[in-house]
């Protein structure tokens, strides 16, 4: 059958040449690129461009012809340049003919800088600054950092906010080179920002295991309590005690006050160490009585079987009563066996003090005391840990031991932390987090104060008013003491 209707034919001529040439690289963060297009058609505006965004979606581009030379056109298109090559597609006549290329990306120039106080033992805070401000957002978004401390570059663990990056997982006391890139997801990577830092040392607590000791007190045959007699009318006798105390090198106590070897009355009621080592030597001596006998020497029970958490020595701080000018109690007469050869008369004792152990030095003379706290220290730990035992006094059930840590730069407090230690019969681990309120200074001074009581004070009258002790008298001990804190194995943690 032959149609009588006219037939209309439409013929579309496609150009023989339509290709995209390799474009020049653009900086990460660029919003446009220039694409060389080889095209022998009559109207370059018929070519439509698109690119794949970071989510993989096709985005249409705006385009402008910048120049044309014979069949080669330089076309500027809108893009979003990320950290990997930008895939470009050009289409003609509704997609009947397409061409594709990829735009390589370059890391825009930037610097990496770090303030000295921003470099810690295991972390460092660095700032990335683009040479051209228009690329700062791209640097903030795409920069990846690498470190080198051994001759090999490794991807650095870091977090960032804006252009400030915090590198973590660093090694203490180590020199690092740092560089960065924004185009790490393409084959040809370029880097910028060479920077060199040295991390702080991860210094430990000075002599924190209390193993390095020096002798501070050696007392021989002072009166242990008052005089006593087994029967009324018999001669009276005097028990004595001898002891040697060692303290950790670099640390100080208030023993010069509580165990004052210059006190007018050298008696155990008035001269009582508030700090001592678990490896101390202490011997009580009871004189023998003619005919009856019953004398002997021994160590008081409180000083027996003392142990350290690790190593050979721990330190003990305790509340004690003391008196620089104490008066001897009257003799005590009794009619009991030799196990009771001691005086039960308790004198009036003027003062009560908490035991203290602290970094620094201490002096006492004529009712005047001086604390020189702290030691040179240039690291910045995040936490102090240690082990303790604590026995409160029966007269103050709410009492606790206290440990405080302070890091300073001269007079400026950088960080501090305090913990109250409650009753514990066995060694128990404790943690003191250090809260930093100033981070734009380096540390140069460390203070640690360990006290047997939360009533501890720099005022002697306040301590005497608030600290409780219990009187103890037995065959080999005569003193008034209270809450007791044993401490060992102090160490710093760095994060």
Q: Which residues does each predicted region cover?
A:
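Aromatic (Trp/Tyr/Phe) and Gly/Pro-enriched flexible surface segments
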Residues: 194-383, 400-431, 445-495
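Beta-strand-rich modules
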Residues: 170-186
